[in-house]
Amino acid sequence: FMNAFLIASLLLDRRPPRMKPSRYPAVSILIAAYNEEASIADTLRSIANQDYPGAFEVFVIDDGSHDRTAAIVDACDHDWLRLLRQPHNAGKSAALNRGLAEASHDLVVTLDADSFLYRDALRNLVERYMSDPPNTRAVAGTMLVRNSRRNWVTKAQEWDYFHGIAAIKRVQSLYQGTLVAQGAFSIYDRATLVEIGGWLDCVGEDIVLTWAML
């Protein structure tokens, strides 16, 4: 039934096509990191390889890590990168709110410290946001399992991501009603984030944030 509904919705899709804007806006990227020494370098490398035509700034908020996360970020030589240190582990919401307070651009992207972006990911996300109706305040990025062919567990996770996240979000977007813009990769209107008070300190902070925007 889910697949049939998805196909029917795609055939009847009236969502505006994704267009290239005349000017790509500057964006602020927030990455909350806690003990992410195994992945943070790859995440930053994927950002450095983006083909995004506009400017961007990246804030890695080290949430009191006990490993080499902060040292790895500090060693990266990028003029768009800033490391913010939390004095102790206060949770992901507090880290993101710290980054939001420092962000200087009107569009804010959240990215997990173990997310890896395809080269065109940021450009596609911004184009989708800019092409949607003027009252759009957030757009969820596409999420895939990076190691989906490794074993049966990752294959099962890929299936869960497709039906539980990708397919459902695709259908919701056709009706301009995405219920969750996941924190792993989404874009938000900064003024709206500030207006609703940012991220609440709770489990599923991205869910609560999205619902506050609806």
Residue spans of the language-model regions?
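N-terminal membrane-anchoring/stem segments of glycan-assembly enzymes
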Residues: 1-23
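Long helical/loop segments within the catalytic core of UDP-sugar-dependent glycosyltransferases
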Residues: 2, 93-95, 119-203
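Cell-envelope/extracellular polymer assembly enzymes that use nucleotide-activated donors
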Residues: 25-28, 57, 208
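Acidic helix N-cap motif at the loop->helix transition within catalytic regions
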Residues: 39-42, 67-75, 120
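Short, acidic, metal-binding catalytic loop of nucleotide-sugar glycosyltransferases
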Residues: 45-55
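A conserved acidic beta->alpha catalytic loop
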Residues: 62-71, 88
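Short aromatic/hydrophobic "clamp" motif used to bind/position activated sugar donors
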Residues: 108
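The conserved acidic donor/metal-binding loop of glycosyltransferases
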Residues: 112-116
